[in-house]
Amino acid sequence: MNIDVVHLLEQNPILLIFVVLAIGLAFGKIRFGKLQLGNSIGVLITSLVMGHLGFSFNAEALTIGFMLFIYCVGIEAGPNFFGIFFRDGKHYFILSMTVLVSAVGLTYFCSHYMGLDFGLSAGMMAGALTATPVLVGAQDALNSGLATIPRNMDFSLVLENLSVGYAMAYLVGLISMIMFAKLLPKLQKQNLSDSAQQIAQERGLGNSSQRKVYLPIIRAYRVGPELIDWTDGKNLRELGIYRQTGCYIERIRRNGILAHPDGDAILQEGDEIALVGFPDSHARLDPSFRNGKEVFDRNLLDLRIVEEEIVVKSDAIAGKRLSDLNLSEFGCFLNRVVRAQIEMPMDLDIVLAKGDVLQVSGEKSRVHGLAEKIGFISIHSQMADLLAFCSFFILGIMFGLVTMTFGQVSFSLGNAVGLLLSGITLGFLRANHPTFGYVPQGALNMVKDLGLMFFMVGIGLSAGGKIFEHLSQVGPQIIGLAFIVSVVPVVLAYLVGAYVLKMNSALLFGAIIGARTCAPAMDVVNEYAKSTIPALGYAGTYAIANILMTLAGTILIILS
C-alpha cells in the first residue's frame, strides 16, 4: 500500500497540526552545549518550514490556543499579583517597568528609523525579550481592531511579519540573556555566590540547593535520673527542646496514661516520652535523653506523620515574615516554600504573600491546626473545577468586547487583556477559597503549554510561505535590532537596581531575569550563585512582567 504523506497531511489538518507539534517539540530538545532551543522556538521553526513547503492552515482556527495560554498565565499570576508590593515589591515593579518601557521605546524608534514593515517590530521585540505574551498581545490587537493594518498590507502578511520577526530574534534574546548573566557580574567585579551567601547570612538561610528533605521520625525514651538532673525542674517551655535540637515532645505516658503535653508540663522520672524530629535533630539530642532506655511501644509510637502543602490565605499572615509563624509552637517542620511555581530559599525573613505554598510535615493534627491558622491544605484531587474555569473564560472574552469611548475615540481592551484580568481574578479567588476554581497544576501547565503550541503552529504555517525572502531582506537588521533590544533594557535595569535601588546582586539578577520572563537563564544564574537565592528576585518580577509584556505587545502594534 502506497501512502502519499503530502496528500495525507493536506487532507487531514488535525493530523498536520500534531505532526508539526511532534517534530517541533523534538527539535526543541536539541542542545548546543548548555543551550536548548525550547518548545516554543522548536515548534515555530518547524511550522515555518512546513508553511514554506506549502502546507497551510487557517490560523484563526487556532486563536483558541493563545486565548487559553494567556488565560492560564493570568490564573498562575493571580495569587501573587495583588501582593506584588509587599517588602521589595516596589523594586520589582520598577525593574519590570524599566525593562518594558526601554524595550518598547527602543523598538519603536529603531524600527521607524530602519523602516521595518508593519508587524516585524512587535515580533522582533517578543523574540528579543523571549516573551511570548508580547506576541499574543500584538496579534490580539490586530484581531480586535485596536491596531489598524496599513492599506498596502493584509492580515496574513502582518501575521507573517510577526512570526518571522519572533523566530529570527528569539535565539538572539536567549543567548544574550545568558551571556549577560555570565559576563556582567565579572565586568562589575561581583561574585553572585558571595552575594547569595550575604543574603543567606543576613536572613538565616541554609543552602537550599543542597538541602535534602526528610519526613520527621519518632523515637520514644524512658526518662532516667540523668535527664531529670538536666531539666533541673524546668517545664518544657523553659527547656526549649525544640529550639535547641529541632525535636519536640509529642506524647507523654505517665502511670499508664497517654497525654499530649503543653508548655507547662514538667518531666518526671519514669515518664515515657515520644519525640518527633528529623533524623539529624534526633542525633543532636542531649545524651541525657538517650541514657534512659529507648521504648518500643505501639501505643506510644503510633503517630500519623503527614506531609501537606498549605496555601497561605489568612490576611493576618500575609505580609508577615516566615519567622513570625513560630512553627515550633505547632510542632511542625517546614520543608520548602514555593511561590509562582518557583522553589524559594528557606528564608526566615521572607515576607509571606497570599498564594504561597508551604510544604509542611509533622503529626497530622498539628499540621491541620497550622493550616487552619494560616490558610488551607491544598486539594490533592485530580478533578478540575471546569465550571469555574469555563465561566471565567467567558467573562474574560465578554470583558474584552466591552467598548469604551473617550470623546471621539472608542476602543475595547481585546481578548488578551480581558482573559488576563479574568484569569488573575480566578487565581486570586482560588487562593482565598480552596473549594472554588481548583485546577490541578499539572492540568493547568498542559492547557497553557498546548495552547501556546497551537498558537505557534497557527502563525508558523500561515507565515512560512515567504520566510526565506524575509531572511534575505531584513535578517541582518532584525538580528542587530534584537541584540540591542535584548541587551540595553537589562543593562538599564541592572543600573537602576544596583545604583538607585541598591539591591543585592543575587536578588537583582533573579529579578531582571523574571522581568525578561527568560526561565532558561534562571538555571544559569542559580548555577553561578551556587544557590536558589536568586529565585526570590525572579518570583518577585515574573508575575507582573507577564502581564506587562502582554500590554506591551498591544501598545507597540498600535503605535507602529
Curated annotation (Swiss-Prot):
Keywords: Cell membrane, Membrane, Repeat, Transmembrane, Transmembrane helix, Transport. Gene3D superfamilies: Regulator of K+ conductance, C-terminal domain. InterPro entries: AAE_transporter, RCK_C, RCK_C_sf, Transp_YbjL_put, YidE_YbjL. The chain crosses the membrane at residues 8-28, 37-57, 66-86, 91-111, 164-184, 386-406, 409-429, 450-470, 478-498, 505-525, 539-559. One of its GO terms (molecular function) is monoatomic cation transmembrane transporter activity. The keyword DNA repair does not apply. It is found in: Cell membrane. One of its GO terms (cellular component) is plasma membrane. The keyword Lipid metabolism does not apply. It is a multi-pass membrane protein. Residues 205-292, 293-376 form the RCK C-terminal domain. One of its GO terms (biological process) is potassium ion transport. Belongs to the AAE transporter (TC 2.A.81) family. YbjL subfamily. This is Putative transport protein VIBHAR_02636. It comes from Vibrio campbellii (strain ATCC BAA-1116).
